[in-house]
């Protein structure tokens, strides 16, 4: 009977009464000690192993988060680079398609011309004031630190020359366009299939026009030579 009760108590994790250090499952010393089931107690080594596993999982999660953050940063940088490249290409295309005719160049040079004129006038005023004070004897003039009037004046004239050249070129282009419209106002037909324009010249007609223009130029040349010979006749 006692043996059966002891077996039941061992299964339930209860120490067997009587006798010092009775053990039930894992018995506690002393009479009537309460036992603990084998699966309920964990050794310190197992606890350390679990803690290490938890720490490793946390470290892995942190690494994964850092990798995700780095990937996001890289994506943002790539997007910024792509945007910069698109903006640069758009600027280059805009610069290429921008008008580079002489009138546009003149408009661009108006601003620097205004600044150069203002700087030149200010420099001249400063020099006049310094010379006046020096003549009055109230101040000594330091020639090394004096403003360079000649430099600013040269810059002003340089911009004026650029504007003048662009305007002259524009005038010549307009004259050429006017002459072209005057002497050959009708477009020339090529050897391709006939174009829908009804007022286009054929190639034979174009040759006749060219011959007439050559003859006209030759007549002018001969007239000029005769006039030169009449003005200064040879002995």
Curated annotation (Swiss-Prot):
Transmembrane segments: none annotated. It is found in: Nucleus. Residues 1-54 are annotated as: Disordered. InterPro entries: Mediator_Med29_met (IPR021018). GO terms for cellular component: mediator complex. It comes from the Eukaryota. The keyword Transcription applies. Component of the Mediator complex, a coactivator involved in the regulated transcription of nearly all RNA polymerase II-dependent genes. Mediator functions as a bridge to convey information from gene-specific regulatory proteins to the basal RNA polymerase II transcription machinery. Mediator is recruited to promoters by direct interactions with regulatory proteins and serves as a scaffold for the assembly of a functional preinitiation complex with RNA polymerase II and the general transcription factors. Component of the Mediator complex. This is Mediator of RNA polymerase II transcription subunit 29. It comes from Anopheles gambiae (African malaria mosquito).
């Amino acid at each position: 009977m006692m043996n059966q009760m002891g077996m039941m108590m061992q299964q339930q994790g209860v120490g067997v009464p009587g006798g010092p250090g009775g053990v039930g499952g894992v018995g506690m010393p002393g009479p009537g000690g309460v036992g603990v089931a084998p699966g309920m107690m964990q050794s310190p080594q197992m606890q350390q192993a679990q803690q290490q596993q938890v720490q490793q999982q946390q470290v892995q999660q942190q690494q994964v988060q850092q990798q995700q953050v780095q990937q996001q940063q890289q994506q943002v940088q790539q997007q910024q680079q792509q945007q910069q490249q698109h903006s640069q290409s758009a600027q280059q295309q805009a610069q290429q398609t921008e008008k580079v005719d002489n009138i546009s160049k003149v408009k661009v040079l108006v601003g620097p011309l205004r600044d150069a004129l203002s700087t030149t006038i200010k420099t001249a005023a400063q020099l006049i004031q310094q010379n006046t004070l020096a003549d009055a004897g109230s101040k000594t003039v330091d020639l090394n630190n004096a403003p360079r009037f000649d430099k600013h004046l040269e810059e002003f004239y340089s911009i004026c020359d650029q504007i003048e050249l662009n305007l002259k070129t524009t005038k010549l282009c307009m004259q050429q366009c006017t002459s072209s419209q005057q002497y050959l106002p009708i477009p020339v037909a090529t050897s391709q299939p006939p174009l829908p324009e009804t007022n286009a010249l054929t190639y034979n007609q174009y040759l006749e026009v060219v011959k007439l223009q050559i003859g006209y130029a030759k007549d002018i040349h001969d007239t000029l030579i005769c006039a030169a010979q009449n003005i200064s006749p040879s002995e």
